[in-house]
C-alpha cells in the first residue's frame, strides 16, 4: 500500500466515520479494514466548564455549535492484529457555524502550559472531549504500537491539540501520527515548535481553493507539519465545495497511486514517509 493509498484506504474512512457515528440511529460504520470500534468520543460539558468560563462568548459559540449537532464528536477504533489505534474527530456540518468566530487571540495550551499558545475556541472544543479520548485509548487500546489521529475541518484543528496531549500526557509510550484534512491553523508559532518536537509525523491534506486551511491568519497562527496539496475541485459560486471531505477524496484519487512505498511497521499498515509535499 502506497502513501496515497494509505490516506485513501485508512485515514479518509476514519475521518468520514467520525461524522457517520453522530447519526441517530448510527449506520454501519465503514471503518478502515481490520479496525473495530472501541467507542464514540463523547462531549462532557462539565469537564469543559473551566475552559468555557474563561473563553470569550464568540469562542464558546464554536463548542456550542459542535454540541448542538451531537454530543458525539468522533470515535476511537482499534486494530488488534497490528496494535494500532485511530482517533478520529469530526467537524461541524457547515463551516458557517464557526468560521466567523475563528479570529481569536491565542491563549495558553491548558494540558501543557509551557507548550505555547493555541486558538481559544479550538481549545474549548478539545476540553469537551479530552477525558473521553483518554479513557477510550487506555481501556480499549492497551499496548498500542501506533496511534493515528485524524480530523476534518474544525476536527483537524482539534486533532492537533489532541495529538500533542497524547504524546505529552497520556502515558501511552508512543508518539501519535497526524493526518488531517482541511484543518485550520490551531496554534501560535511557539506551540507549533513544541508540537514539532513531540510529533515527528504530521501531514495536512489541503485542497486547492479551500479557504479553511488559510485561517486563522499568520503570523499570530502557524500550521504544524507538512502540507500535501491536492486538486479535488472547487466551484466559484459555492465556497464550501472545496472544503467537503468527499472533494478531498477526489483530490487524493487524482494523485499517482504509486507514490511512496515505505516499509511496513507494524505489518499490513504502512508508515507514510515519502508523500510528495509542499511547505505550508
Briefly describe each language-model feature range.
Residues 1-150, 154-280:
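Non-catalytic, mobile gating and regulatory segments of ester bond hydrolases
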Amino acid at each position: 500500500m502506497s502513501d496515497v493509498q494509505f490516506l485513501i484506504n485508512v485515514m479518509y474512512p476514519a475521518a468520514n466515520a467520525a461524522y457517520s457515528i453522530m447519526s441517530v440511529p448510527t449506520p454501519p460504520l465503514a471503518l478502515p479494514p481490520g479496525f473495530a470500534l472501541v467507542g464514540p468520543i463523547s462531549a462532557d460539558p462539565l469537564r469543559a466548564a473551566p475552559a468555557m468560563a474563561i473563553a470569550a462568548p464568540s469562542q464558546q459559540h464554536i463548542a456550542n455549535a459542535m454540541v448542538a449537532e451531537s454530543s458525539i464528536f468522533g470515535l476511537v477504533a482499534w486494530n488488534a492484529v497490528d496494535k494500532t489505534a485511530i482517533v478520529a474527530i469530526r467537524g461541524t456540518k457547515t463551516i458557517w457555524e464557526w468560521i466567523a468566530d475563528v479570529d481569536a487571540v491565542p491563549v495558553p495550551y491548558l494540558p501543557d502550559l509551557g507548550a505555547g499558545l493555541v486558538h481559544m475556541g479550538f481549545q474549548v472544543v478539545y476540553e469537551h472531549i479530552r477525558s473521553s479520548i483518554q479513557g477510550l485509548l487506555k481501556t480499549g487500546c492497551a499496548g498500542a504500537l501506533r496511534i493515528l489521529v485524524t480530523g476534518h475541518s474544525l476536527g483537524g484543528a482539534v486533532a492537533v491539540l489532541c495529538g500533542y496531549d497524547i504524546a505529552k500526557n497520556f502515558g501511552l509510550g508512543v508518539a501519535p501520527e497526524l493526518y488531517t484534512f482541511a484543518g485550520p491553523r490551531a496554534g501560535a508559532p511557539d506551540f507549533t515548535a513544541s508540537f514539532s518536537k513531540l510529533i515527528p509525523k504530521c501531514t495536512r491534506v489541503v485542497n486547492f481553493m479551500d479557504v479553511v486551511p488559510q485561517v486563522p491568519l499568520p503570523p499570530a497562527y502557524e500550521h504544524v507539519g507538512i502540507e500535501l496539496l491536492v486538486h479535488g475541485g472547487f466551484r466559484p459560486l459555492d465556497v464550501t465545495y472545496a472544503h467537503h471531505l468527499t472533494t478531498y477524496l477526489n483530490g487524493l484519487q487524482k494523485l499517482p497511486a504509486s507514490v511512496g512505498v515505505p516499509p511496513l511497521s507494524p505489518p499490513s499498515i504502512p508508515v507514510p514517509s515519502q508523500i510528495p509535499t509542499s511547505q505550508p
